[in-house]
């Protein structure tokens, strides 16, 4: 409740316009065009509860388009297992809450798997957006050797295993996506070790 109140105070005081998109139980909020200087030009939120907006006076709500990346990520965050992983991975750096690299990779992997499945099912999903998540995960995997391991279980582990297997048969040119000094085999072995996928 305190966090929600702080968010709404920021939105109200900044004079933001409010937009929202909702589908399949997911809720995404975007606040733009603050009237007061010094406020972030955009705030984006993923809400676990669709009633987040209810009872808020002085907030105008208008529908916005939610693209594949946003709807996929919001759906992931609304999944209890991924939401718990998200909370587990938050750390504070210089007073700012950030998500550790070892926690970002599973989200990128899941977004890739979801968008790929939707595209294969016939949905109109841009192939470039599908590939982007995979490439992002592989770029970030270069940093996993410096991170502590994350013990993934259940669907989280299954999804990461599926991503690793997909990469094993894929044709990503690592040099072209900015990965230097590591082979695909080395990256995938690092992932397996980081996320407890060995054995």
Which residue stretches match the model-derived regions?
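Compositionally biased terminal segments of proteins
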Residues: 1-199
